[in-house]
From Swiss-Prot:
Pfam families: Ribosomal_L31 (PF01197). Belongs to the bacterial ribosomal protein bL31 family. Type A subfamily. One of its GO terms (molecular function) is metal ion binding. This is Large ribosomal subunit protein bL31. The gene is rpmE. Binds 1 zinc ion per subunit.
Length: 71
């Protein structure tokens, strides 16, 4: 490997928009601002909404299902 071509891998202070702060390692710099983290993301907090696509799929099949059948 060539010497002195890789970026520095430093400790970075990460701040979320919800106010959560933690440290990790990165080559991006010393401060990193993010929009969502594990404390405010809906998937991790249990507030994720499941969309009901069954009605839409059935509506599509009712309208266009006849085109897939052979006579």
């Amino acid at each position: 490997m060539k010497a002195d071509i890789h970026p520095n891998y430093e400790v970075v202070a990460v701040t979320c928009s919800c106010g959560n702060k933690f440290e990790t390692r990165s080559t991006l710099g010393s401060v990193l601002a993010i929009d969502v983290c594990n404390l405010c993301h809906p998937f991790y907090t249990g507030k994720q909404k499941v969309l009901d696509t069954g009605g839409r799929v059935q509506k599509f099949a009712d309208r266009f299902g006849m085109f897939g059948t052979k006579k």
